[in-house]
Amino acid sequence: VASCGLWYHRTLYSLRAVQATSLVIVIVDFHTHSLASDGALAPMELLRRAKAAGVSQFALTDHDTTAGYLSVRHSSEAHDVGLISGVELSCRWATTTIHVVGLNFDAAAPEMVAMVERLTNARQERAQKIATRLAGVGVHGALEGARAIARESQIGRPHFATWMSESGAVTSATEAFDKYLGTGKIGDVKMFWPPLTEVVEAITVSGGVAILAHPLKYRLTGMKLRALINDFKLAGGEALEILNGRQPDVDIKRLSQLADGCGLMRSVGSDFHRDFEYGPNVGVDVARLPDGAYVWDALETSG
């Protein structure tokens, strides 16, 4: 596999060509979250929000689970928004936690099922450790409380924070993080995520496209960011997320140049969790994007 600087072998089409030949793809969104992970809306409600926004290609990319996608994939709303399979998988690169979005894979593929199960188990083990640590400082019943908040969602620290606030252990979820759950606090249990290479392989072997999510969020130096992108491509990654939520044009331009220089397609998404957190709504208007090779050129929408 070629390193950064050499163009990717797949035949791609520019955004300008897409706009010239079709008026269907105007608003897309390949990075969103529902109640199945840490979003605020039920999967069906999120699809309806996407439909109202005029989205024509859409992916529900919950953290380390495909449950939300599976629950709505055969609905009429899924057809209306051009729903494809999606997930945002956690992994590690060197000492940094990285997120990789997978799109348009077979959700029933053994490799994908095994990876989701592996990550779900890791989250459950971390939840148990968090609860044990909290009990050690007098906060009892945290695991049961967090699970009740999470219900069918992937359990995480926000669920503990919500339960602690509602139970009176703290005055707010913010206080829960400040005192117990934030970085360096008693409930900050580190995860041992699978390596980047294994997560990318699970996506690609399952027939999907692997996308490096929000590259600037990791706060890497320029040299380390280029090294990450190069390793991502060597592992089989195919696209770089150049926009997620609200980003200035200078960041979009920089990430576009990095993608082009490494022969990667570009992807975009709102990273929608709830209203006015990362962006006002689902959907990205492609008219604001610079010309280039975008991931939707290589996707086939499932009905």
Locate each region found by the language model.
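Flexible, glycine/proline-enriched loop segments at strand-loop-helix junctions
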Residues: 113-122, 148-150, 186-187
